[in-house]
Amino acid sequence: ARAAGACLAVLPENFAFMGRSEAARRSVVEAPGDGPVQRAMAEAARELGLWIVAGTTPVAVPGDARPANACLVFDDRGRTVARYDKIHLFDVDLPGRDEGYRESANAAPGREPVVVDTPAGRVGLTVCYDLRFPELYRRLVADGAEILSVPAAFTAPTGRAHW
């Protein structure tokens, strides 16, 4: 990508781990600022000379047993320059099905919108279900966002309604 002129790469939500159980997901929760996924992303950014919006990975939240679904941004020197914790968690019952999703049972919600300066422009960070909440995007644009990033991992039963 860098050879073709790219300066920014964006990875999907849950790019590093899409486990089938919450117990498995909890086993890969990383401390803020350190962990194998964060180290790998920092190294990739350095080696490739790219800024990376690293989709999401579970990152511990002090004072909460639930991790954040955190979107981390790494600059081309491998430094973490921004963190956005998904604000709008996906809680839904699927009509006509005996299944649903309760992301809030296993993830702590974020609190603040984040805009980060990158070589591509000012990027407003959001994740997946956030796209259902236009006020978040209005706020990001008011805060100077020129590009809106929406890493997502919708499932087949729910994705069609969102895209």
Place the predicted regions along the sequence by residue.
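Active-site catalytic loop in hydrolytic enzyme cores
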Residues: 43, 62-143, 151-163
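Cys-nucleophile CN-hydrolase/nitrilase-fold catalytic domain and related Cys-dependent amidase chemistry
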Residues: 1-77, 81-85, 91-92, 155-163
